[in-house]
Design a protein with these regions (language model features):
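Conserved, short, structured surface segments that act as functional micro-motifs
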Residues: 50
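Right-hand nucleic-acid polymerase module
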Residues: 1-47, 57-144
């Protein structure tokens, strides 16, 4: 999602836009959309704030296009490790052109909370130098 150039500000503008958008969605659907989004300061000539995100739900495209009022939208129809990596990289992106800008995560409460009850969480519990940090890929392979 991309903001029109006439909207000023940085993360506070994006935070308000997401909040107002979710309120419009809730008014229409009577329920909330589970989401995980992060802001990015654009490069090149525009330097606009972008929001990259993942939205949970089926058939949301027309609803998003109808209710998002803040600029351009690109909607993909899939989520893979590649798309998740693309979106989450903005949490740690070093922007040399805007060194004071830090992306802000905007997400539904409780995303990831079920992880704490999984065996993986116990395996990855902090144990000083003995901490195991294993990631399991979609194909079952483990990365340490």
């Amino acid at each position: 999602m991309l903001f029109r150039s006439n909207i000023k500000g940085e993360n506070s503008v994006a935070t308000q836009a997401i909040r107002l958008w979710l309120e419009r969605v809730r008014k229409i659907t009577k329920k909330s959309i589970k989401h995980w989004c992060i802001t990015e300061r654009g490069g090149n000539a525009t330097e606009r704030i972008h929001i990259h995100g993942i939205l949970w739900g089926i058939g949301l495209e027309s609803l998003i296009r109808e209710t998002w009022k803040y600029g351009f939208i690109f909607i993909g129809q899939y989520v893979t490790e590649k798309t998740i990596n693309y979106i989450t990289k903005y949490m740690y992106k070093k922007d040399e052109k805007h060194p004071t800008f830090t992306g802000k995560v905007l997400c539904s409460a409780g995303i990831g909370s079920q992880y704490t009850t999984r065996v993986d969480a116990k395996n990855n519990k902090y144990k000083g130098e003995n901490t195991k940090e294993t990631y399991r890929c979609g194909n079952g392979a483990k990365i340490n």
